Amino acid sequence: NNSGDINCKNITCETITITEALGDVELDNITAVTIDVINNSGDINCTNITSNELSIEDDLGNIYLDKVICEENISITNSSGDIDINNIESTDVSIEDDLGNITMIGIDISNGTITNSSGDITIEDGSVETLNVKGDLGDIELYLKGELSDYDYTLETDLGDVEVNEKDEGSKGEVINNSKNLIEVSNDCGDIKLDIK
């Protein structure tokens, strides 16, 4: 579609592929094995999605996900705009944003990779096994479920403070518990906060 909004609702199929040049894309109550969405300029909203693989690319616009279950992986790339994710379950999640905030609330994932060039990264009410977070400019705050002893973690910032469960760790915090769960966070400029309770 070259210009205009795209709305897809109440669809069950094998594959959904959407390419939009200018306009918003909305998916609601979709069940498909593979879902691919590419948008050059406009918001992307996905709610009530069940899939094996979900891929979203946006050059300019906000991305919003709510109530998404993916058996295998979720991949999200945004050049400019916020990424807001609520209530997702997936094995692998990869998120990359060049300019904008990344906010994730109520996530249950096995492996997560999150990269942001400019903007904050926030995870609340998160359940993860392996998490790798990289920020260039912005604060990183992770509020995860469980016990601190359940995780090995390495948190390091070049310019900013590191805080683990409300304890100041300076510019680097590291603990090796020989746990199966691993958190690695690096930041060039900005604070890092890890809270596991």
Residue ranges and their predicted role:
Residues 10, 25-38, 44-58, 63-197:
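Short, surface-exposed interaction patches in beta-rich subdomains
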Residues 1-8, 16:
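Low-complexity/repetitive intrinsically disordered segments
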